[in-house]
């Protein structure tokens, strides 16, 4: 069971980081398709996308609590995240405005992930592939930073980072596609 959860986590992580990098890269150009009133909303998308990524990883770890019939641990870790979110919103909103909400959301989901990653080790020893996880996180955060701070030639750098994330995770995404297509082929 540990091997199964570790493999699924690795594949899931690969897919999520590739999607996240792609969404971050495309968020600003896609805003041109909307009315001018919505263009400025692009600045909220990058951090909310990473927050959503960590929420997805949290839900994966939540499945371990459910399998092991330890749902109260899920409640405790989510409560810690909720308290952190409230405190961080109180701290960030006066200083950085609406971007404080997105930053607080990201940091809160990251906290929940870290708590669950440590906490679930006592229930099921998953290999989180920490080097892969940290590398993906650094690459996507660099992409977000370049875009939000509008560094010179940010579009080129963000494109290169997205290609890098996708190349780094290619085997994982390909493995997931093979499994999905293999199952679909057997059903037909």
Briefly describe each language-model feature range.
Residues 16, 79-85, 133-145:
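Hydrophobic membrane-spanning alpha-helices of multi-pass integral membrane proteins
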Residues 20-28, 86, 90-91, 113-121, ...:
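Membrane-embedded alpha-helical segments of multi-pass transporters/permeases
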Residues 32-33, 67, 94, 121-122, ...:
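Transmembrane helix-loop junction
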Residues 42, 72, 78-114, 146-161:
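Membrane-interface helix-loop junctions in multi-pass transport and translocation proteins
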Residues 61-69, 117-130:
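Alpha-helical transmembrane segments
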């Amino acid at each position: 069971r540990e091997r199964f959860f570790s493999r699924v986590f690795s594949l899931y992580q690969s897919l999520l980081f590739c999607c996240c990098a792609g969404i971050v890269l495309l968020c600003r150009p896609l805003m041109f398709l909307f009315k001018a009133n919505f263009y400025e909303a692009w600045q909220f998308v990058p951090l909310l996308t990473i927050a959503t990524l960590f929420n997805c990883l949290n839900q994966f770890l939540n499945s371990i609590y459910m399998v092991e019939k330890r749902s109260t641990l899920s409640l405790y870790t989510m409560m810690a995240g909720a308290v952190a979110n409230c405190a961080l919103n109180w701290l960030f909103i006066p200083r950085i405005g609406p971007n404080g909400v997105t930053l607080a959301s990201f940091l809160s989901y990251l906290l929940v992930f870290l708590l669950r990653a440590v906490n679930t080790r006592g229930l099921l020893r998953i290999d989180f592939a920490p080097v892969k996880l940290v590398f993906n996180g650094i690459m996507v955060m660099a992409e977000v930073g370049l875009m939000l701070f509008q560094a010179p030639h940010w579009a080129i750098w963000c494109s290169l980072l997205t290609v890098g994330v996708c190349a780094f995770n290619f085997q994982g995404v390909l493995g997931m596609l093979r499994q999905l297509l293999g199952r679909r082929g057997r059903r037909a």
